Amino acid sequence: VALRDHPLCADIPWDGVEFWWSDERFLPTGDPERNDTGAFEGLLNHYPIPAQNIHQMPSSGGAATLDHGAVDYWTQITAEFGDDIAFDVCLLGVGEDAHVASLFPSSEAVRVSTPRVLAISDSPKPPPERLTFTRPLIEQSRQVWLLASGAAKADAVHCIMTMSDEVAAPASNVRGSLRTVLFLDDDAAALIEPDEDTSYPADEEYLSSEYS
């Protein structure tokens, strides 16, 4: 909502902006648990964005199976980008367990070393069926923005800053090709010590401020 109501949004040339999803819950279109439902309600329905610029992940009502949904979305991506897949920005929320997209700690998905869209049938966080980018596909973004807010995310943020283990803490090792930024509120940043030795690359950055 804060983004939707920002005065600069009215000046964005929306016909030149394409929207893709890095993960989605495999539920019917319009289900309140789907990420795209919130995106439409919070932003996309409020600006003149061409329908062909909005690339939703398949839904359980539209795809034949979860596996077909993963293949279909990967086909859409390769049809759009060819062999040179490059997203401008990938915005990722950080989970309390330091997961990003639907890449959960110690799962098989975090070990996949090629760029692709995966079908997840056993997510530890409901619903179990999801579609997700692999980490290598996420990292074909020029910028990766990681967003965390609230005290419940403080441990995850501390992991991101002090370790580099893509299996145990997937968010700790995801990088944009040009820039990686952590956007934090004060509660999420509470465990970061200014003089702490961190594994987070010096050329990356984190921004801590109150936001809504």
Regions picked out by a protein language model, each given a short descriptive name:
Residues 136, 142-212:
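ATP/nucleoside-binding phosphotransfer catalytic cores, i.e., glycine-rich phosphate-binding loops
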Residues 10-88, 202-205, 210-211:
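Ligand-binding beta-strand-loop-alpha-helix segment within the catalytic cores
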